[in-house]
Amino acid sequence: MDTWHDALGGEKQQPYFQEILNAVRQERLSGQIIYPPAADVFNAFRLTAFDRVKAVILGQDPYHGAGQAHGLAFSVRQGIRIPPSLLNIYKELETDIEGFSIPAHGCLTAWAEQGVLLLNTVLTVRAGQAHSHALLGWERFTDTVIRQLAAHRKHLVFMLWGGYAQQKRKLIDSQNHLILTAPHPSPLSAYRGFFGCRHFSQANSYLSRHGIDPINWKL
């Protein structure tokens, strides 16, 4: 199994998946603003090929402010103000990775292109309404993504931040992969143990031990 088509082709034919796409399409047609734009919903898969995934960072649902979401968890487009959770991720990187300096932008495309799958468990959201698409069925699809990676790839790093992401731990075989958990990087919880978790250096140590090129976290 080498491609997303191999891993997810059957899933995308399932009635529930077609129903999700139809529901989102109907909302857009009715004039509801949905983020990210239709062309960006599956960006994480476009930028990070199945056979090149090294690490998975799990988010919840997309940013719901104008111009922010572009299909990569935690990331925003160039020119958009860095959201608080991402700024905390940068602060942790600054103390964890030698030579990392906080960039002036929040675009994580460079990570995605190196094999960091920035996966939201829900792939769309209504403008201004967090979790508004939580019940559409996206999680059935993204759970399959996690399962397929865990089953058909070896030595991946899964970063699960916050209780919601950590519920996905049960989908991953810890014998074959590294599972790193910490509180969410949001300002509400980062001080409870996200700061100091050193997930980024731990990920690179694990990858190197298994003969896999480490990730250049610098942006």
UniProtKB/Swiss-Prot annotation:
This is Uracil-DNA glycosylase. GO terms for molecular function: uracil DNA N-glycosylase activity. Keywords: Cytoplasm, DNA damage, DNA repair, Hydrolase. Excises uracil residues from the DNA which can arise as a result of misincorporation of dUMP residues by DNA polymerase or due to deamination of cytosine. It holds the Pfam family UDG. Disulfide bonds: none annotated. InterPro entries: UDG_fam1, Ura-DNA_Glyclase_AS, Uracil-DNA_glycosylase-like, Uracil-DNA_glycosylase-like_sf. Coiled coil: none annotated. It comes from the Bacteria. GO terms for biological process: base-excision repair, AP site formation via deaminated base removal. It is found in: Cytoplasm. Belongs to the uracil-DNA glycosylase (UDG) superfamily. UNG family. It comes from Neisseria meningitidis serogroup C (strain 053442).
